[in-house]
């Protein structure tokens, strides 16, 4: 059965299908999503939600905030997650004692994450790393809802952490995740790009916020055994990307 307009050649047909595949695949997405949920192994969040590295008179604090990425899902200990990796890099760069804290929950969407904003934890933070948006895209939230929810969340974080630089992790290219079969991967990739663009716009509209891309090469070594969450290698890459951004901004206080 023809699924593209008559009168187009093979190359044009391929381009047409790539543009329209997410819409064509939407009816299959719920069934495939259920299959993935049953198939993907359940793993644990990392231990060590607080910790300290480095030495020196200077004191810095990094907070990992948001969803399963920052909760360290599929990582043994937060020493190896983005929280610990950032703390170690900050300690080395600034010859400081750096503490980390984690305010994150697996499965959190932007509205759920609002309940994780804890002024007692965030008030003295120097750097806050935020991962949010994948679950909003996965759970079928509308773009208008996500824009509203993530804007409210960013404002709450900035208010609770008056001196912190806040870094958002971009929504990764979900179409490349090993755990997602096609056409579900194409649907998720399409939604992920839309939600990523919203996050980018909301970051640009606020002071003290920056963002790192999550669209680098994603080989098998970048994923945990579930094929969905980041491995220790990818957590380290996130931390390296943040440190590159910090090179371009005023030194942490």
Map each language-model feature to its residues:
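Extracellular glycan-modifying ectodomains
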Residues: 2-13, 112-116, 135, 174
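N-terminal secretory targeting modules
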Residues: 1-63, 247-253
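Conserved SGNH/GDSL esterase-like catalytic core that processes O-acyl groups on lipids
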Residues: 61-63, 69-149
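Short charge-dense sequence patches
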Residues: 30-43, 60-67, 97-108, 145-154, ...
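Alpha-helical cap/lid subdomain in secreted, periplasmic
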Residues: 115-253
